Amino acid sequence: MILKNKIKTRTEDKSTITDQAEVILAHRYYLKDTDGDVIENSSQLFSRVALAVASIDTQYGKLPVDAQLTEKDFYTIMSNLEFVPNSPTLMNAGTEQGTLSACFVLPLEDSMEGIMKAAHDAAMVQKFGGGTGFALSKLRPKGDRIKSTHGIACGPIEVLKTLSRVSSMITQGGKRDGANMAVMSIYHPDILDFIDCKKVEGEIHNFNISVGVDSNFMKAVEGNMDYNLINPKTNEVAGSLNAREVFDKIVYGAWRNGEPGMIFLDQVNKDNHVKETYGEMIATNPCGEQPLLGNESCNLGSINLAKFYKKAEKAHAFGWKAEIDWARLEWVTRKSVHFLDNVIDANKYATADIEEMTKATRKIGLGIMGFADLLIQMQIPYESQLARDAGSKIMKSVREWADDESKQLAKSRGAFPAWEDSNYDKQTEVYRNHCRLTVAPTGTISMIAVTSSGIEPTFALAWKKQNILEGKTLNYVNKYFEQDARKHGFYSEDLMDYLAEGGSLATVPEVPEWAKAVYATAPEISPDDHVLMQAAFQEACDSGISKTINFPNSATKEDVEDAYMLAWKEGCKGITVYRAGSREKEVLVKGNADKSEQPTLDGFELEEQMLESNHDCQGGCNIVFESGCETCKTCGWSACLIS
């Protein structure tokens, strides 16, 4: 791999990088020579990224000495694990290959040329290391006449299968399989076929699917009313369906195997400030948290909230038993916005159209991770109003600082080029970036930062990791839980074994009630509380949030329906659900205590899946499904490109 800039080695505090993080970095992120041998360490990786991204400052009139100060700040926030950019930036910054962005949406026009261009551009994006989203909503329905050839349209589902086959041929950035999202409007005549297109597990395996709905449809569901289907080619009514029956079909699919998800498009487009000029956002990136216009891309990064815990001498006015280092959080937020804006210019784009559109709106996605770990340190149960209030306050603060920093950048660099065509207030809302915040899945980068993923609760307190080479199986325990268990006298190896086998802390009599509440895991938290937490963060987030609403295996279709309705009423931009054990080909997530609550995968299928997915946990796989994405807690493999 060729470097654009000479790497400068720094001395680092090795304690910030754990052994597990080191394994993940070596396997997935460190540069390697032609023999595949690692040629950098974590300090050099962060130096490489900081130098490449900070050098952009000189394009905006800064002196080299000022760019060096920026480089130092960028290195600091990354090496301290206070901020970590999305995986493509870590992998590719400072090299001659690959993109620095993870999220793309490509236009899919209703013509042979448009479909083939989308397939070509998707291949180029995924070759560069990105994931792609498509809206099928503009494609004419199956069976429509094609005037130019007197033929019959194959329909959106066949186009989707074609895109899936193209994606299967590409390994993203040489490191992972293609990842995609397909969205179809609820008003499309082929919507029923779309809802069922992944009914057979394994079909269209490299696409997530979501149905795009709006409040009119949801109100029709509530009223058990019919609604019209619209042919996108003619804009004429093509039939009608009962909204309740279609909604029930969506719910059944989600209950059956987690798909389709739902995207509330009218809620999404409330934050589309260039709608009058560029149209509506009707698709998202593969994990669903980043709505984009056709040919837009977005680079993401996440602040590690667990790093901002600060002990307090007395209870905070909010009722918290600890404090947050707000001053440091503001500083890191501002540096992160600066970093992400620079990435837009440091980036290498797969097509000229993507570069043009991305630089027109200059969207960035600053998010968070480590929220559950912060709550644990503050002794606040995730399943509480206090936790939701904390999340809301944090997100509103980050939004305020991110908005202001984007305004400051606009003063020195100019507003995003499409700003003149936007509905932003021309006196008070002069932004460098069309949107600023996105809560992405952080499966792998949160493992590098040794923290919880996104805004998800802790998935497990203990889990088993097999070391095939040494023939050992070891328990890995959440560090905060182990500290508290030892401090308060309820630690035992038997308890750790029990939890690693899938047992619940709630059933252990000797564990105090406060610990059971603070350390409740994702499968134990009610679906309503999952949704309400997502909504608490969504209020201040101008893009979307990737989060999984966890259900036990025993959940009913009515339970899933309630979650979908609650997400809509609470103002979420989308929803993804997962019922434990609802997919045939899954790996064990937490021991063996209750098989009915655990997905399973036999050894042969597991080995085959991991090889196909560039998985390298040597048989000690530990997959969790969170933030709408499968991630291995052992080796850092993730199905999501952002992670």
Please tell me what each predicted stretch does.
Residues 141-180, 310-344, 348, 469-511, ...:
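A structural-propensity feature for long, helix-poor, extended segments
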Residues 19, 282, 288-291, 340-345, ...:
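Catalytic alpha/beta core of large soluble enzyme barrels
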Residues 7-15, 101-318, 322-326, 349-353, ...:
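Active-site cavity-forming subdomains of large catalytic enzyme subunits
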Residues 1-98, 106, 247-256, 577-582, ...:
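Acidic/polar, glycine-rich intrinsically disordered N-terminal extensions of enzymes
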Residues 54-96, 100-104, 109-111, 232-239, ...:
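Gly/Pro-rich turn-and-neighbor structural signature
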Residues 1, 588-620, 624-626, 631, ...:
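Acidic, low-complexity intrinsically disordered tails
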Residues 17-25, 76-92, 186, 335-346, ...:
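Core structural elements
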Residues 332-355, 359, 380-442, 513-516:
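Internal maturation/activation junctions in enzymes
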